[in-house]
Design a protein with these regions (language model features):
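Intrinsically disordered, low-complexity segments enriched in small/polar residues
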Residues: 1-127
Length: 127
């Protein structure tokens, strides 16, 4: 088992947004170990809302087997939903290594990560 985190996304943009997850490397998914990163793939977040509610969706890095020496990582893309489709707003690459999560945001996407405690928290905000 690897280091886990509770993650949520807050939409402070005037328009609704849609999220896409890709580039998943060494992260449990689809309920493995309780981690469900796929929850965010295709998720629509209404303006001025946070998804999911509560403490967030649990995600967990894989820290065994082939992944023991590899950085766990994924990319979260954020698109604004427009009348003509979608417009990219930015993205954030989230990575975990040695029980610490890190972020690399672009565009209108920010992330605040707290690595203290048994589980990290990852709060992504779109402006």
């Amino acid at each position: 088992m690897g280091y886990g985190a509770y993650m949520n996304v807050t939409n402070n943009n005037a328009a609704d947004i849609r999220l896409y997850v890709h580039g998943i490397v060494c992260v449990h998914n689809n309920g493995d170990e309780g981690s469900n990163l796929s929850y965010f793939n295709g998720l629509e977040v209404v303006s001025e809302q946070t998804e999911p509610g509560g403490e967030g969706q649990y995600i967990e890095a894989i820290a065994s087997g082939q992944c023991i020496q590899e950085m766990s990582t994924f990319t979260l893309d954020v698109n604004e939903i427009t009348g003509n489709g979608q417009q990219p707003l930015g993205s954030v690459v989230i990575s975990e290594q040695f029980n610490k999560y890190h972020d690399n945001p672009t565009g209108s996407v920010e992330a605040v990560i707290d690595n203290d405690g048994d589980q990290a928290t990852i709060n992504v905000t779109v402006t």
